[in-house]
Curated annotation (Swiss-Prot):
Keywords: Amino-acid biosynthesis, Cytoplasm, Histidine biosynthesis, Lyase. It catalyses: D-erythro-1-(imidazol-4-yl)glycerol 3-phosphate = 3-(imidazol-4-yl)-2-oxopropyl phosphate + H2O. GO terms for cellular component: cytoplasm. The gene is hisB. This is Imidazoleglycerol-phosphate dehydratase. The keyword Cytoplasm applies. Transmembrane segments: none annotated. Pathway: Amino-acid biosynthesis; L-histidine biosynthesis; L-histidine from 5-phospho-alpha-D-ribose 1-diphosphate: step 6/9. GO terms for biological process: L-histidine biosynthetic process. Its main location: cytoplasm. Coiled coil: none annotated. InterPro entries: IGPD_sf (IPR038494), ImidazoleglycerolP_deHydtase (IPR000807), ImidazoleglycerP_deHydtase_CS (IPR020565), Ribosomal_Su5_D2-typ_SF (IPR020568). It holds the Pfam family IGPD. Belongs to the imidazoleglycerol-phosphate dehydratase family.
């Protein structure tokens, strides 16, 4: 009888005095998403993250938006990272590494990931304005810092060039999504093995 593949899903509920967040992910999904954070631009970016990684995501965030968007964005990154880490389990069989240069109109951004269990963010992205609409551009970095730290991944993001700040932010999310899509995939030649000479990635 054929062996049934284990479900690679993860769910997290996180409540603080600042935010209340629930996240569910399915690494073997089709990029379906149901997202509500109260921050329109952020919802748009998270939809790109789900769509292009093919990770199904359900995200419900309620935060102190009367102050600003910071806590909602950062804490959502924390919860998504924790859910992805749960879904990865002991990380046996995964491809582990991936990188991509992603183009969008005049903008080009590179993302490289290592699902190593060692959290680290290298961020080389500059925006020419402090806001995209009402969204603080500095929060793009805050999101990816929280994601990398809590997913246990090494993440490098480099914007090669670009003029439109919306495009720069969007290519960051899309490039990370495409890199995650490849890195989280099961390598058929690696099934059941941890892709590390150490024997563990957690």
């Amino acid at each position: 009888m054929a062996e049934t593949a284990a479900s690679r899903t993860g769910s997290v509920s996180r409540k603080t005095n600042e935010t209340s967040i629930s996240v569910s992910v399915n690494l073997d999904g089709t990029g379906k998403s149901k997202i509500s954070t109260g921050v329109g631009f952020f919802d748009h970016m998270l939809d790109q993250l789900s769509r292009h990684s093919l990770i199904d995501m359900e995200i419900e965030s309620q935060g102190d938006l009367h102050i600003d968007d910071h806590h909602t964005v950062e804490d959502t990154g924390i919860a998504i990272g924790q859910a992805i880490s749960k879904a990865l389990g002991d990380r046996r069989g995964i491809t582990r590494y991936a990188s991509i240069d992603l183009a969008m109109d005049e903008t080009m951004t590179k993302a490289a990931v290592d699902l190593s269990g060692r959290p680290f963010l290298v961020w080389n992205v500059a925006f020419s304005a402090p806001k995209i609409g009402t969204f603080d551009t500095e929060l793009v970095r805050e999101f990816f810092q929280a994601l990398a730290q809590n997913a246990g991944i090494t993440l490098h993001i480099l914007n090669h060039y670009g003029a439109n700040n919306h495009h720069i932010a969007e290519t960051c999310f899309k490039a990370v999504a495409r890199a995650l899509r490849t890195a989280t995939e099961i390598d058929p030649r690696q099934v059941g093995r941890v892709p590390s000479t150490k024997g563990t990635l957690v």
